[in-house]
C-alpha cells in the first residue's frame, strides 16, 4: 500500500530493496507521485491477523520455529500474548491505517469461523471499533460481512477439497437461504 500511496521514496525501507530487484528509478519516481493511490482501502482483519514473532522459541513447545536466515523465531497469534492485548484489535489497526494514509476505508471482511454467538460478538466488536474510529475522525465508509453466503473448503484455504461448508450470514443449505444469527445482528446494527 505504501507503494501505491506514493510513500516509497528515497529513505523508505522498500526503496533500496526495490531498486536492487530491478525497479527503475523512473518507475519508483512515477509511483511516488501518489497518482496510483486507491480511492478506498479495503481493510481485512481477522482475530489471528496480528502476529507476534518471538525469538524465545523455548516458550512455545510444539510450535515450529521459523527463520529469516539470520534469526530463529516463532510466529504466533498476537492475541495469545497477554501483554500485547491492549494494542491489538481492529480499532488500533483502523486508526493506524487512517493516520498513515488518510484514504477512506471500507472494512471488507468481517468473519470469525466459530460459534454463531462468537461470530456475532466479533462482528459487533469490529462494527463498534469502526464507529469509534469514525467518531475520532477516520473516514470509514463501510463494514461488510464475509462471507455472506458461506464458503466451501475455505478453512483449509482451499488446500483440501473435502466439501466442508462454513455458513455465512445466510445458510444456503435451505431454499431460500436462511438468515443466521449473524445476519440478524448485522441488520439490527445497520438500523441503529
Question: Model segments located where?
Answer:
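Active-site region of glycoside hydrolase catalytic domains
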Residues: 1-124, 128-192
Amino acid at each position: 500500500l505504501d507503494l501505491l500511496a506514493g510513500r516509497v521514496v528515497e529513505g523508505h525501507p522498500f526503496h533500496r530493496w526495490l531498486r536492487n530487484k530491478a525497479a527503475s528509478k523512473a518507475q519508483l519516481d512515477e509511483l511516488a507521485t501518489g497518482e496510483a493511490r486507491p480511492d478506498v482501502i479495503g481493510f481485512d482483519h481477522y482475530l489471528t491477523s496480528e502476529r507476534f514473532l518471538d525469538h524465545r522459541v523455548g516458550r512455545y513447545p510444539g510450535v515450529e520455529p521459523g527463520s529469516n536466515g539470520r534469526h530463529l523465531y516463532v510466529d504466533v497469534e498476537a492475541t495469545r500474548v497477554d501483554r500485547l492485548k491492549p494494542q491489538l484489535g481492529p480499532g488500533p489497526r483502523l486508526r493506524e491505517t487512517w493516520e498513515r494514509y488518510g484514504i477512506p476505508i471500507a472494512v471488507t471482511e468481517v468473519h470469525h469461523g466459530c460459534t454463531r454467538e462468537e461470530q456475532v460478538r466479533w462482528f459487533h466488536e469490529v462494527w463498534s471499533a469502526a464507529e469509534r474510529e469514525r467518531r475520532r475522525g477516520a473516514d470509514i465508509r463501510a463494514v461488510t460481512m464475509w462471507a455472506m453466503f458461506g464458503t466451501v473448503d475455505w478453512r483449509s484455504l482451499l488446500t483440501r477439497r473435502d466439501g466442508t461448508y462454513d455458513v455465512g450470514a445466510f445458510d444456503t443449505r435451505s431454499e431460500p437461504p436462511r438468515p443466521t444469527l449473524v445476519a440478524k445482528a448485522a441488520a439490527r446494527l445497520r438500523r441503529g
